[in-house]
Design a protein with these regions (language model features):
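Short, conserved micro-motifs composed of acidic
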Residues: 2-4, 8-176
Length: 176
């Protein structure tokens, strides 16, 4: 089917009546098709390992972000909430001498609130966290992108990144 798709995309790109933005989209799909076909012909080893009891809990953990030195992992954990049934908070785990992840610690206030924070992304040096927060009073939309700077061992008050990144819509999943 990849070859059939390639033929149709190539024919579309040659059409004089096709809109330029649609031609660009078709070219991107051609590139994706090339990657997919090559990836299937040349698989790479993939052996995921459980991160262990220091990170995993009875609820869900997701959106991990690791510092460039591979020594700290920041992630989102789904937790029970008094306001909502569930909400999300950030946790940090440190790599131990035996290469296991230490018991994750809640990042705490002012980053974590009784509202919803998710999809964190560390800066390379681990001194900034970019993340999504929803329903905050200063939000431009339902969810906005924020950042917090680390001062010693304490995370600073989250700052809304503002316009033009945040709009009246839903902004989420920042990647730094």
């Amino acid at each position: 089917k990849y070859d059939d798709a390639l033929q149709h995309f190539n024919e579309f790109v040659k059409m004089e009546t096709a809109k330029p933005e649609k031609k660009e989209e078709a070219k991107n799909l051609i590139a994706s098709r090339e990657f997919a076909k090559d990836a299937l012909q040349h698989p790479v080893p993939f052996a995921p390992q459980n991160a262990g009891a220091g990170i995993n809990s009875e609820t869900d953990e997701y959106f991990p972000s690791i510092t460039v030195d591979n020594k700290r992992m920041l992630f989102t954990r789904k937790i029970k909430s008094d306001i909502y049934e569930w909400q999300e908070d950030f946790y940090i785990s440190t790599l131990q001498q035996d290469s296991s992840w230490g018991k994750a610690k809640n990042v705490g206030a002012p980053v974590n609130t009784e509202l919803n924070e998710g999809a964190p992304s560390y800066s390379a040096d681990g001194q900034l966290i970019f993340f999504t927060a929803c329903d905050r009073p200063e939000s431009k939309g339902s969810c906005d992108i924020y950042y917090s700077r680390k001062f010693g061992d304490v995370w600073g008050k989250p700052i809304n990144i503002g316009s033009p990144v945040n709009t009246g819509a839903w902004e989420s999943q920042p990647s730094f």
